[in-house]
UniProtKB/Swiss-Prot annotation:
Residues 18-162 form the Globin domain. Heme b binds at residues 76, 111. The keyword rRNA-binding does not apply. One of its GO terms (molecular function) is oxygen carrier activity. The gene is CTT-Z. Keywords: Heme, Iron, Metal-binding, Oxygen transport, Signal, Transport. Belongs to the globin family. It comes from Chironomus thummi piger. There are at least 12 different components in Midge globin. Residues 1-16 form the signal peptide. This is Globin CTT-Z.
Length: 163
């Protein structure tokens, strides 16, 4: 039990540098431009990193272009994008840190139990940022805001995944 208390404190510490209101606004406005493109986002991730697609039993070994139009693919893409949408909606307010922690903790634990590696998390991040930056107005300020946001999330997730 003591271990989990220490882990929780470490995770809270990792997200204790919340986005400023300006950063949160940049992340929220850019996300609003792409969050309805769930299928395209997941397609981009799988296309760039087939090893990630291979981690999903329902998609492993299947032609990406043929599964892109399936209901199963759309459903899973929506789950992933909804997770980010919820985190982003909560960002920018320190009063939401415990809610953010809860979401990140559950996601990190779920993915640790599935054997997802830090490398695969980083691949996902790279593909996600590539998709967003290619589909919104992307300047240094937006890039910095997304880097801060994702650094917070990934620092916390990696503490869980490597524990």
């Amino acid at each position: 039990m003591k271990f989990f208390a220490v882990l929780a404190l470490c995770i809270v510490g990792a997200i204790a540098h919340p986005l400023t209101s300006d950063e949160a606004a940049l992340v929220k406005s850019s996300w609003a431009q792409v969050k309805h493109n769930e299928v395209d986002i997941l397609y981009t991730v799988f296309k760039a990193y087939p090893d990630i697609q291979a981690r999903f039993p329902q998609f492993a070994g299947k032609d990406l272009d043929s599964i892109k139009t399936s209901g199963q693919f759309a459903t899973h893409a929506t789950r992933i994008v909804s997770f980010f949408s919820e985190l982003i909606a909560l960002s920018g307010s320190e009063s939401n840190l415990s809610a953010i922690y809860g979401l990140i903790s559950k996601m990190g634990t779920d993915h640790k139990n599935r054997g997802i590696t830090q490398t695969q998390f980083n691949e996902f991040r790279t593909a996600l940022v590539s998709y967003i930056s290619s589909n919104v107005s992307w300047g240094d300020n937006v890039a910095a805001a997304w880097t801060h946001a994702l650094d917070n999330v990934y620092t916390a997730v990696f503490q869980i995944v490597t524990a």
